[in-house]
């Protein structure tokens, strides 16, 4: 089992309510020369969302699937869609159902997204418990960095710009009909 004491010690502490320290690309560049080739490819798979056989990634990907299926089921129920394809017959977890329910009840889409990001963050914390200087610690860091990168896209300016663009498109469509 490889240990990456120096690399992990040089990484900044990530906090969900903190800033994005650097991009996932910068992280991969940093890792390229300091981890084994096999572990580097594993980190790439983690960040791309590609299926992997590593137990840590399998557990996280299974968790993501459970969250996504719960989102589909609860959204379809909210829209009164009864197609069996929307039903979640897979594994379920109470905290996932509760968080998804809370997120879908939010009027503010940003708050809903932050609830879901927090759910993922906490799960990564659980998975990485007792992993400090190994590949699991780096995988957790990479996936948290990816979550922070996603969160950094939620800016007021970009949100307002997107709203104006959509509103303008609707106005144009109404004017043309």
Which residues fall in each region the model found?
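Extended alpha-helical surfaces
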Residues: 1-177
